[in-house]
Amino acid sequence: MRIVFMGTPDFAVPSLQRIASENHDFEIVLVVTGRDKPRRKKNALPEPTPVKQSALELGLPVYETDDPSSAEFASVVLASRPDVIVVAAFRILPPAVFSIARLGAFNLHASLLPAYRGAAPINWAIIRGEKVTGVTTFFLQEKVDTGSMILTENVTIAEDDNATRLAEKLSVKGAALVVETLHLINAGNVSVKKQDDSLASKAPKLTKENTRIRWNSRSAELCDFIRGLAMKPAAWTTMDGKTLKVYKAVPLESPISLPERGREPGLVYIDDSRLLVGTVDGWISLQQLQLEGKKIMEAQEFLRGFRYENREQPLLLL
């Protein structure tokens, strides 16, 4: 079976590797990925995508594009004569491309569809406090993330999972699901299930605005929000006029002695080893953070170097 594989980030790499390992059944004739990104360091070579890096290590042909709607790209895919197109964390494909594959094109999506359709399903599942998520393979159609489902696999979200750790778990589960899907297609034994649109939910693209911490929330919700955005792009707030990224926080369970002014959302309270922030129903302890211009630090290290000049005024995170 001739396969064109399309993907860009780390999430897609295990799927590419699993397909390549089964070369007695599958032949990857082309790997499509995004273009190399320029590095910040002067005179440094552009940085290849994780998928390109893996493909080159596997000795596979690579085509780079940031415009899957171009006529040139469609011609390249057509010339590859794919039986199947496999997509994992790539751009939106037009019908002119995904219809080229003789046996169809399918996508690996990091949720249990129709839940969390969209660009950031891993993040939003954690942010919304889900205990279980999963991976789905489905045939592509013109409307994004709505095609008929082939296989699904549940994955438990652990209490200490952040988006990075959950993505790693889902990528491994997803790779196995991709290979299983390919075997079903190869055997002509695929059965599909239509998505129930009434059960659909959205996982919109992460932006500067929707990753900002809103302190007027409950402690548990804030901690889910923070771990759902860690380690990238990271939940953020402002401290004394500077951007503060927060990577880990936990609700405060033991009582503390509070200053007379009491608690309010965003109010900072510092003791010898903890940086506490008020919420609508309690306090959370910020455990890993990064102030603008500084490295990522644990709270104790951060507090050793932290100076707040206006001690008479409460320090608020905004």
UniProtKB/Swiss-Prot annotation:
Database matches in NCBIfam families: fmt (TIGR00460)
Binding residue positions for (6S)-5,6,7,8-tetrahydrofolate: 111-114
Similarity comment: Belongs to the Fmt family.
Name of the top EC class for this enzyme: transferase
Keyword Nuclease appears in the UniProt entry: no
Native source species: Chlorobium limicola (strain DSM 245 / NBRC 103803 / 6330)
SUPFAM superfamilies xrefs: FMT C-terminal domain-like, Formyltransferase
Coiled-coil region: none
CDD domains: FMT_core_Met-tRNA-FMT_N (cd08646), Met_tRNA_FMT_C (cd08704)
Tagged with keyword Nucleus: no
Alphabetized Pfam families for the sequence: Formyl_trans_C (PF02911), Formyl_trans_N (PF00551)
Encoding gene per record: fmt
Annotated protein name in UniProt: Methionyl-tRNA formyltransferase
Catalytic activity line of the entry: L-methionyl-tRNA(fMet) + (6R)-10-formyltetrahydrofolate = N-formyl-L-methionyl-tRNA(fMet) + (6S)-5,6,7,8-tetrahydrofolate + H(+)
